[in-house]
Every structure is written in structure tokens, then in C-alpha cells.
């Protein structure tokens, strides 16, 4: 069976040494797509076949894309959790990939927290204002640049 695989060009999984991995990673940080000449040079320097370098770069790009997508998704979840959105997502027919803040808070409540928490009627009848945020804390911005006051919002009616 190994003879038939060899004839079809199917290779076993390459096991790279630490030095080879470091050199490949270093090149990947410089450029996500490697040119044919760079691939040839790198393969010679590392004692690998060009096809191994090519496949390593393909696999590494896929890993890089997947990690970027996960990062974007987790940032979206974070922003969704921080936004004060009183509209029901189900009413807008929008399914979120993130659990709602309510769902997470329900999973993480402890009996001690419930004992110390005022009851519903006590919360509704309380005349005390809600606690104020500490003004010495720096504000949290959800936008890449926090100079949003100068940005005009236009609507298309």
C-alpha cells in the first residue's frame, strides 16, 4: 500500500524540527505569501522539499485566518455584552453567536449573591439613586479612535 501512495505523490505528515519551525515562523511574520524564489531558498536552507514549505505556509495561513476570525468573534461578543441594548434580539430576528449578558449572569450566580441581593419589590421601591461610577477611572471606548464627537452622522431618508 505504501508503494501506491508513493506513486500518487501522497506524502506522510512532515515533522519539523524546532529550528525549522522557528525559521518558517520568522518568514511567515515577514510575509504571509512566500514567493517561489524565497520558497526555494528557504527549503534549501532548512533541508526541506519546496512542497513541504509550500504546504506549511498554506496550513499556517489557515491557522492565522482562523485565529483572526475567533478574535473578531470574541470582540463582537464583548461589544454586544457591553452595549445597553433594550431591544429584543428575537424581535429583530437576529440570532447572536454570543450568549446574552443575562444568560451568563444566570449561570454564574451563587446562592450567597442571591441572599445579599435585594428582592424585586425592594429594588423597585428604593429611593436611593443608583451608585455612580468612580470618576477617576478612565472611560471605556468601543471605537478604535475615541474622538467620535467630531464625526457627523448622516441619515438617508
From Swiss-Prot:
Name of the featured protein: Homeobox protein DBX2
Chief place of localization: nucleus
Role: Appears to perform a very early function in establishing the identity of a subset of cells that originate in the region of the ventricular zone in the developing spinal cord and in the hindbrain.
GO cellular component: nucleus
Region (Disordered): 105-157
Keyword terms, alphabetized: Developmental protein, DNA-binding, Homeobox, Nucleus
Highest taxon listed in the record's lineage: Eukaryota
GO biological process: regulation of transcription by RNA polymerase II
PANTHER family on file: DBX (PTHR24331), HOMEOBOX PROTEIN DBX2 (PTHR24331:SF4)
Upper lineage: Eukaryota, Metazoa, Chordata, Craniata, Vertebrata
GO molecular function: DNA binding; DNA-binding transcription factor activity, RNA polymerase II-specific
Family: Belongs to the H2.0 homeobox family.
Pfam families: Homeodomain
Tissue: Localized to the central nervous system during embryogenesis. It is found restricted to the rostro-caudal and dorso-ventral regions of the hindbrain. In the ventricular zone of the spinal cord, it localizes to the dorsal part of the basal plate. In the adult, it is detected in ovary.
Localization: Nucleus
Polar residues: compositionally biased ranges: 118-139
Known DNA-binding region: 9-68
